[in-house]
């Protein structure tokens, strides 16, 4: 599985956990996989890492939102932000610009017209604080 695909599956797992309120990364990841597709270490670490650090990640996002509340952001955008912030804060081997670019590409696929600009702005602010 390519890293882009793993990130997309991770975003879908975070989306699912947000909607259901269930923070079970194993089940959420399994529900995103196509038939015959297997998870990989990168995907598992993204979803499991988010669950482990959810409070810290959400607080970091809140501190960098201007005129928005985390709870009012669309679930898709919130999931993309959470995934990217986890990657930026806890996966130091991945350059921040790569993470931001990947988040923007995922937003183009899953978000609305404004998602990519919004996500780029928030993540750029967060990058400056890390």
Curated annotation (Swiss-Prot):
A Pfam match: NusB
Keyword RNA-binding included in the entry's annotation: yes
Cellular component aspect of the GO annotation: cytosol
Keyword Transit peptide: no
InterPro entries on file: NusB-like_sf, NusB_fam, NusB_RsmB_TIM44
Gene Ontology BP annotations: DNA-templated transcription termination; transcription antitermination
Family per similarity comment: Belongs to the NusB family.
Name by which UniProt lists this protein: Transcription antitermination protein NusB
